[in-house]
Amino acid sequence: MTTTAEKVVVMTPVYNIFFNSIINNGRFILESPLHYENGAYEIDFADLEEKLSDPQASLLILCNPHNPVGKIWDRGTLAKIGELCAKHHVLVLSDEIHCDLTKPGKDYVPFASVSETCRENSITCVAPTKTFNLAGLQTAAVIVPNPVLRHRVNRGLNTDEVAEPNVFAAIAPVAAFNHGAEWLDSLREYLWENRRYAEE
């Protein structure tokens, strides 16, 4: 999705593997720091637009919900990110791997669901690995509504031979998503209780 020496924008603090992946693939990092105020992290949109407007910036890795700060971006925020990225011709890679691990009763908003602009200029990555503790199976899914972009993604996945799951990686997510809702509800309650306990 990018070429060597292009720049990838990330909103920090963020999952450290993003840094390794960007650097190891010969790209450069543009950090747009989140601001922490009144107990919450917010996007500095002036800074984000400055980074997106860099002529070498070609990709924004969006963490939604954000890891590690736990921020669930609202629809308006995601729409603004989408508009800025489209304006500056920057593709959005939305890492939504933590989407199921929200506060009980609180859902996240998928980036691609916000608008046509967001849908047509995004790649969404999801996986059962965090939610159902299946990381060892190395299974994930990539959702790309735009057919032209999907073709590029398919070519990249097959070129790098990462689209070859084993039989367990194909079956386990189906079982987890089809039969794990009750367990997931209990897990979310348990995790939220742990958080409350840690805050006391």
Give names to the regions the model predicted.
Residues N25, K87-H88, C118:
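Helix C-cap/helix->beta junction micro-motif
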Residues N24-L30:
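A short helix-loop-beta submotif of the ANL/AMP-binding
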Residues M1-K7:
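Phosphate-binding glycine-rich loop
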